[in-house]
């Protein structure tokens, strides 16, 4: 997997040039979620293309850091986005998933589910 690092909103997001997926470390994701301005900037620049591999069924992705198969799970209750997650290194977002998660967060999705 060939990843290119992109600096967007002061955070590093790694992008796969083949499938347009994104890898975000756990630390970077926490930083994104703590700053509304970063969320807004990422939402403005990230492509919202659909995942070209979605019709192929469930595909397990290897972590680009440790090459262990990542776990699939819903990002957060109510998000309707299934991510690939390495508990040691971060989150893999298929093409279009990171903007969908950021839309969910910007709409108060994390707060809404935390209060219920």
Residue map of PLM features:
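The feature marks the first
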Residues: 1-17
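Cys/His-rich metal-chelating microdomains
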Residues: 1-2, 19-22, 68-69, 89-92
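Intrinsic disorder/low-complexity detector
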Residues: 34-58, 110-116
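Short Cys/His-rich "knuckle" micro-motifs
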Residues: 3-8, 26-29, 71-76, 94-97
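Short metal-binding segments enriched for Cys and/or His
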Residues: 21-38, 90-107
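Short, flexible, mixed-charge glycine/proline-rich loop motifs
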Residues: 5-10, 49-62, 75-80
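Short cysteine-rich clusters marking metal-coordination/redox-active sites
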Residues: 16-19, 63-66, 86
